[in-house]
C-alpha cells in the first residue's frame, strides 16, 4: 500500500510540474517575444502558418498548436486588428478561413526567432544530449497518450510517423530562420558559392 501512495504522489508531482513549467515557459516566451513586438500566442500562430505553409486554415493551425479552433480564431482576430495577418475565405470551400502573415508579421517573426532560440538554449543547457533525447521521448509518449484519450481509436502510429517528419521539417526551417536572423547569417545571404 505504501508503494501505491508513493507512486500516486509521484504522478501528482509530475502532473503539477508539467503544468507549472508550461506556465513558466509561456511567461518566459512572452517576455522574449514581447521584446520583439509579439506575444507568445502570436509567435506560435505565425510559426504554425510558416510550418503549414501560408495560407493556413484555422483548423490546421489549431491542430498544429494543439488548441481549439475557437481559441485560435480569437487569437487571429486580435492579430488581424494588430495588422499581423490577413484572413481570407478559402476559394474551394467558403466555410473555411485561411490566414496569411503580413510583411509586418514576417519582420517581427524574423526578429523574435533568435530571442526564442536564446531562451530555449538557456533552458535546455543543463541537459546533456542524451538527457534531451530521453526527455523528448518521454514528452512524446505522454502527448500520444493524451491524443489517444481525446481521440479513442485513432491511429497513433500514423501520428508518430507524421510527427517525426514534421519535427524534422520544422527543425530545418527554424534552423534556417535562426541562421538568417543572426548577423553572420545575413552577411552570407545572396553570396554565391565558389
Language-model-detected regions and their locations in the chain:
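Pre-recognition alpha-helix immediately N-terminal to the DNA-recognition helix
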Residues: 13, 17, 24, 28, ...
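Charged, amphipathic alpha-helical coiled-coil/dimerization segments
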Residues: 77-140
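Terminal interaction helix/tail motif
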Residues: 114-194
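Short, locally clustered residues in the helix-turn-helix/winged-helix DNA-binding domain
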Residues: 19, 47-53, 113, 140
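N-terminal helix-turn-helix DNA-binding core of bacterial DNA-binding proteins
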Residues: 27-68, 82, 154
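N-terminal leader segment of winged-helix/HTH proteins
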Residues: 1-36, 168-194
Amino acid at each position: 500500500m505504501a508503494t501505491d501512495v508513493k507512486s500516486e504522489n509521484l504522478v501528482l508531482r509530475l502532473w503539477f510540474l508539467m503544468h507549472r513549467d508550461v506556465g513558466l515557459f509561456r511567461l518566459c516566451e512572452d517576455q522574449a517575444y514581447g521584446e520583439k513586438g509579439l506575444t507568445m500566442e502570436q509567435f506560435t500562430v505565425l510559426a504554425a502558418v510558416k510550418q503549414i505553409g501560408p495560407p493556413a486554415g484555422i483548423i490546421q493551425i489549431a491542430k498544429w498548436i494543439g488548441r481549439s479552433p475557437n481559441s485560435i480564431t480569437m487569437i487571429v482576430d486580435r492579430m488581424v486588428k494588430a495588422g499581423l495577418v490577413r484572413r481570407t475565405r478559402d476559394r474551394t470551400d467558403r466555410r473555411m478561413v485561411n490566414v496569411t502573415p503580413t510583411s509586418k508579421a514576417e519582420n517581427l517573426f524574423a526578429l523574435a526567432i533568435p530571442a526564442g532560440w536564446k531562451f530555449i538554449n538557456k533552458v535546455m543547457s543543463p541537459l546533456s544530449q542524451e538527457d534531451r533525447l530521453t526527455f523528448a521521448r518521454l514528452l512524446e509518449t505522454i502527448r500520444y497518450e493524451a491524443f489517444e484519450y481525446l481521440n479513442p481509436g485513432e491511429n497513433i502510429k500514423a501520428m508518430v510517423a507524421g510527427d517525426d517528419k514534421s519535427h524534422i521539417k520544422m527543425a530545418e526551417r527554424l534552423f534556417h530562420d535562426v541562421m538568417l536572423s543572426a548577423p553572420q547569417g545575413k552577411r552570407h545571404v545572396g553570396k554565391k558559392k565558389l
